[in-house]
Structures are given as C-alpha cells and as structure tokens.
A protein has these predicted regions:
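Conserved AMP-binding/adenylation subdomain of ANL enzymes
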Residues: 57-76, 84-126, 137-139
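AMP-binding/adenylate-forming catalytic core of the ANL superfamily
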Residues: 238, 243-244, 254, 263, ...
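Conserved ATP/PPi-binding loop(s) of AMP-dependent carboxylate-activating enzymes
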Residues: 208-212, 224-255, 295-297
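Conserved C-terminal "lid"/linker of ANL adenylate-forming enzymes
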Residues: 289, 316-322, 330-332, 350, ...
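Conserved AMP-binding A3 loop
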Residues: 25-26, 34-61
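Conserved S/T- and glycine-rich ATP-binding loop of Class I adenylate-forming
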Residues: 33, 39-42, 50, 77, ...
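ANL superfamily adenylate-forming
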Residues: 1-30, 151, 401-404
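Gly/Ser/Thr-rich phosphate-binding loop
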Residues: 122-127, 136-203, 214
Length: 416
C-alpha cells in the first residue's frame, strides 16, 4: 500500500500508473464530482453537499487572492476539526495546502504529552473557540508557543472575551503577537466565503468576502437588495458554490435563488455588508422565532448581547414554546468565576438586557423589549457537538421539555 512509508518510490509511481487504465484528461474535468462534505447539523439535520473539482480549486484561488499570503516556506498549520466536517477537511487541509502551507494532523487528539512536541512548531491554528479551552487544560507552563502567530476560527465566533482569554493564554507561553481571525462559510461554498487572515482585522466582523465571489445582501421576505450597512440575508455567487445536495434536487433548488438572471446560493446568514466587503454577522435565518404580533427575534443577536455583560462568560439563547406569544426567549448562561448563580444575578442580567451597551467599535447595541429573554438558567459549560459547535438542538430540546413540564405543573395546580 502506498502512503505507509515516509517516501514514495519509483515503483510506487509505476503502481499508480498501472491502476489507471486510461489517460487522465484534465481538460473539461472541472465540472466532475470531487467530494461530498456534510454539514454539521448543529441547528438541523446534516446535509450531503456535492462539490466539483472547480468548486474546490476556485475556493483555493479566492482565498489566496484575498489574504495575500507571503511566499513563506515551512509555516505549519494545526488542524483540530474532524474530517467529516467541511471546516476540517476542505478549509483546514485542502485549502491550506493550496496556499503552500504544511498541515499538521492530530487524528488521536491532543493530550498533555504530545502537545509538548507538536505545539512549539505550530504557526497557524484552525479550530473553533473550543480549542482554546482544550489548550488551557492540557498545555503545561513550560510549553513554548513563541512561533504561533495566527488563530483562525470557524463555526463559532470569537467574542471579545474569548479573544482576551486567548491572548492571555498565549502570552503565558511566550507569544505576545497572536492574531485572532474570525471567518465564516458554509459547506456549500467549500466551508468559507470570508476571511480575516492577511487583512486588517476589523472587530465584530468575519472579515472580507472573498475576492472572486459576488455577494448580495437582500431582504429575506422581498428578496430585494438592501443598501450597504443595512441588515439582510447574504447571498453568494461564484465558482466555489456547490453543485447540489447529493440525491436531493428539490432541496438544491430551494437553496439556490435567481435574481436578475444570476443564480446565487442563499447562505441563510444575516448581517451587514460594508462598501469594502467586510461582513458583520448578526444571526442566521434558521435561528430566529416569530412572535404572535409578527415581531421576529434573532437568537444570535440576543446571545451576543448577553455575552457582553461583565458577569457572563458565555451563553446560548434559543426559542421556548409559549401558548400566549407562540415563543419566548430562553437563555442558558455560564457565569464568570466567583459570580453566584442566584436570583440576584438573574435579575441583574434581566435588568441589563433593557439597557444600552457599547461594542469594541463604540457602537450602541440595544435589545428591543420583545427580544429580552423571559427565563434564564445557569449552566457550568456550553454543550458542543462533535464539530465543536454549540449544540443548539440540545438546548432547543431542553426548552421544549421545560415548556411541557410547565404545562403539567399548571394542570396539577388546577386539579388541587
């Protein structure tokens, strides 16, 4: 078998030649199927995304043209995301190699022993913010991370708090110049459509829309284009947009839209696009609920607001069924060390949700009265999926079960 030794011999090449019974013709092969990636299913059922050779190559070219990486040999990138997810295989591995970097894989995971030999050589880190928690728990004080310079996240967002925690961690390991980069993407765009790497890192954005892609932000109800810096749903057009969902032509048709004679992929991502192509992600279409008065609540917006509070480490917001308003907001909150999970703390969070806050850009952030959650539970940590994304389905199920229990308790009270 080829690949079990460090070197490939001429005999190995001969075996490869014998395996192919006909000439490999690269001409017109761009539309050929290349691989199938699976969405993480963090907020729904996983989908099988069929990508062509052209999709993968175009994505690599778009990234290289966007991030302007210098021709540096020897840079090593740590991939910490499972291969079955797009961010793990397509972005962290294939696109990294297309950019001329070396990929370091850890199929058996990181532990207190192997990090001593692996991490000192790493320059780039690919993973969700959950990777920081892993590193904090297993990296001893004597491990030198001075060669580290970039941490690229996908799946979940680096908040101001997680970035601050990350800087403190790397500073304790001789690295004071680490850059944290938020990015965003879908499996349908080979796992990425924006990047902060190699460009100016603008707070509260996921970086620039890749050069080569054609973005369009629209009103999700009318599908009419909105102005720059107005909130809407992001559509993407480009050669990196997937061929379709494997075996699901109707689903493919549903996710691709035609506007002015051009076909776009609907990312279902809500945010604002600036004139210089920076995108501020404010939510996802799949993560909202509509009240009986017609008001729409985006869970990400509420979640990000609560995460800014001085006593909150992190939080998750989901919809909870309600007989009167259809839904209410349910927040699961991880408190900072030393903060008591009592009623006073709960009331403090409710009170802050009615006030104005300022983000790092000194912009005012405020919730509407109908966006304020009606109940808060304190948890020790946020549950994650295998892809290191927040397990929204788990929290949605918990909220549904709580609603059912509330109904049962009300019935018991009436019987008494």
């Amino acid at each position: 078998m080829i690949g079990y030794n460090d070197f490939i011999s001429y005999s190995d090449l001969a075996n490869v030649a014998k395996y192919y019974k006909k000439i490999i013709n690269p001409i017109q092969s761009g539309k050929n199927d290349a691989l199938i990636l699976y969405t993480s299913g963090s907020s729904g059922n996983p989908k099988s995304v069929l990508l062509t050779n052209e999709n993968v190559l175009a994505s690599g070219i778009y990234i290289k043209n966007t991030i302007n990486l210098p021709q540096t040999k020897g840079d090593k990138c740590l991939c910490f995301v499972p291969f079955k997810y797009p961010y793990g295989f397509a972005t962290s591995v294939l696109l990294t190699m297309m950019c001329g970097r070396t990929v370091v894989l850890v199929p058996d995971g990181l532990n207190k022993e192997n990090v001593k030999t692996i991490l000192p050589k790493i320059n780039y880190y690919y993973g969700s913010p959950a990777l920081l928690d892993v590193l904090k728990n297993i990296v001893s004080n004597d491990v030198d991370l001075s060669l580290s310079h970039t941490f690229v996240t996908g799946g979940d967002f680096f908040t101001e708090k997680t970035e601050k925690m990350g800087r403190e961690f790397f500073a304790n390991h001789n690295c004071n110049n680490i850059t944290f980069c938020n990015g965003a993407g879908n499996a349908e765009t080979v796992a990425t459509w924006s990047s902060s790497v190699g460009t100016v890192v603008r707070p509260n954005t996921v970086g620039r829309i890749l050069v080569g892609e054609e973005p369009l932000v629209v009103n999700s109800e009318t599908m009419q284009e909105v102005k720059y810096n107005e909130e809407g749903t992001l559509l993407i057009r480009g050669k990196n947009v997937f061929k379709g969902y494997y075996g699901s032509p109707e689903l493919t048709k549903h996710e691709k839209v035609n506007i002015n004679g051009k076909e776009y992929y609907n990312t279902r991502t809500v945010g604002k696009l600036s004139e210089d192509r920076f995108f501020s992600l404010t939510g996802r279409e799949s993560r909202f609920y509509i009240l009986n008065d017609g008001n729409k609540v985006y869970c990400e917006k509420v979640q990000n607001f609560i995460s800014l509070l001085d006593i909150v480490e992190s939080c998750v917001v989901v919809d909870k069924p309600d007989d009167c308003t259809r839904y209410t907001g349910k927040a699961y909150v991880v408190l900072k060390d030393g903060i008591l999970p009592d009623e006073n703390t709960r009331n403090y969070i409710f009170e802050q949700c009615t006030k104005k806050l300022y983000n790092t850009n000194n912009e005012i952030i405020q919730l509407n009265s109908f966006e304020v959650p009606t109940s808060i539970d304190f948890v020790d940590k946020i549950a994650l999926t295998e892809a290191d994304k927040i397990d929204y389905k788990k929290y949605e199920k918990m909220a549904e079960e709580e609603n059912e229990n509330d109904k049962k308790n009300k019935r018991r009270i009436k019987i008494k």
